[in-house]
Amino acid sequence: MTWQSPISPGYSWYEATIPERPVFPIMPGSRKADVAIIGGGYTGLQAACNLARSGTDVTLIDACRFGDGASGRNGGQFGTGQRVWADETEEVLGREWAQRLFDMAENAKRYVLGFAEEHAIDIEFMPGQLSVGHKASLERDYRNHVEAMTGRYGYPHLSFMDREETVSRLGSSHYHFGIRDTGTGHIHPMKLVVGLARQAALAGANLYEGTKALKIEKKGGAVVIETTSGTITADRALIACNGYIGNLEPVTASHVMPIRSFIGATTVLHGHPEILPGGESVDDSRFVVRYFRKSKDGRLLFGGREAYTADNPRDISAHIRRQICEIYPDLADVEITHAWGGSVGITMPRQPFCREVMPGVTTIGGYSGHGVMLANYCGKLYAELALGKSTELDLLKQLKIPAFPGGTRFRSALLFLALSWYALRDRF
């Protein structure tokens, strides 16, 4: 049977379609390291890989298996830029900041694709993305975005799609218009996790699964991490837990909020050549976004139905099927072979959160749905910062990310009320 993550619900199609998932041991006792990393997703594994290649003694631990969180269970879409469009960011932070954040995200895109190519990791990259509008009133915003990106931001890969083109490229009349992006694409996220873990191990990183961090503190000149298998004493540490931070570190927990998102995978869509004939991924304009794409073998992978509490739907497939049928009524009876969920780490402004939470301890997360690119790149940037090679990560440290209101006790309830209001607005 497909592996069931103990921290994320459902059985993932990604898990079922990787040829072999390496197993790493539980940490065999207390140890010392130059750098300790908590979290075996994209950020942590990239940091470990890059540090180990430079001769750093690095120890990485994960409470479960690598990729059990968002890195191995997400929608697989790269996107372009940050989670918030660059022209919208410009209105808040100004032109220079918007450009720098956009350039960082584009660097991230190139880095991930280059890393996979360099190390012959078959991530099943498929080009293209369609961002589609569910309200006719949003057309001017979409047109303005294309003009801004192809103009002052110098990104030539966007084009506006009218209703006829949108219907043709989606195989559905559900949306009014859209934007086609030929400069991005989508991947099999778990294959990237597996390939990355193997590269980190080959580089000499000490990788441990099934080893949970219980406490992190500064003692004298060292960072001390208490775990279920002993203590790690390190010169510095990276917290790369994102939406799975729990109560480990309060600053991260107050700024990065986990929300649940769910995905279903259908059987291969024989007899439906009209659905996404170009193979692009799709995201829509709803606040509670729907995102979907075809796999290389022709399945529809459909994501949506966010949840803002720890509760999960009893039948993930039923929730996903209802949303599929709104867009593709002819798929009412299609078999959903796998359905799963996981936690996405978001911040209030939907920008990444990077902060030194105590001397020598950095936390990175809150990618807000753009982690396939950004999490990998931020792991690399952390390694470069630790090695004194680059300060590009400081760009994110300077962002003023506010804490969520209500503290850890009431923030879920407050966010549920606020986002339920936005979800209601999606319908009108």
Curated annotation (Swiss-Prot):
Superkingdom field: Bacteria
**GO CC, one annotated term:** cytoplasm
Q: What gene name does this entry carry?
A: ordL
Enzyme Commission identifier(s): 1.-.-.-
User: What keywords are assigned to this protein?
Assistant: NAD, Oxidoreductase
What is the protein named? Probable oxidoreductase OrdL
Sorted alphabetically, which InterPro entries does this protein's record hold? FAD-dep_OxRdtase (IPR006076), FAD/NAD-bd_sf (IPR036188)
GO molecular-function terms, A-Z: oxidoreductase activity
Checking SUPFAM superfamilies in the record gives: FAD/NAD(P)-binding domain
